Design a protein with these regions (language model features):
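Phosphate-binding and adjacent anionic-ligand microenvironments
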Residues: 1-73
Length: 73
């Protein structure tokens, strides 16, 4: 499991980020039934929590960083 915290200026509209949505769908498709992707907003600070679970730690880390970059971008 890999967790990346992505600090943003504001969480407003993060769910509507098409780049993040596309990358999330691609990551989940890559993992298939062998892993999962979870992205949620922190309840206490302007941070997105990006979590990727997979048996392959390197793959989880790579996908989580890619999702974090999409969230920033």
């Amino acid at each position: 499991q890999t967790l990346v915290n992505v600090r943003l200026a504001s969480l407003a509209g993060w769910q509507d980020n098409p780049r993040l949505a596309r990358r999330r769908d691609e990551a989940q498709a890559e993992l298939g039934s062998e892993g999962r992707v979870l992205i949620r907003a922190s309840g206490t600070e302007p941070v997105l929590r990006v979590m990727v679970e997979s048996a392959d730690a390197g793959r989880s880390r790579k996908l989580a960083e890619s999702l974090a970059e999409a969230a920033r971008g």
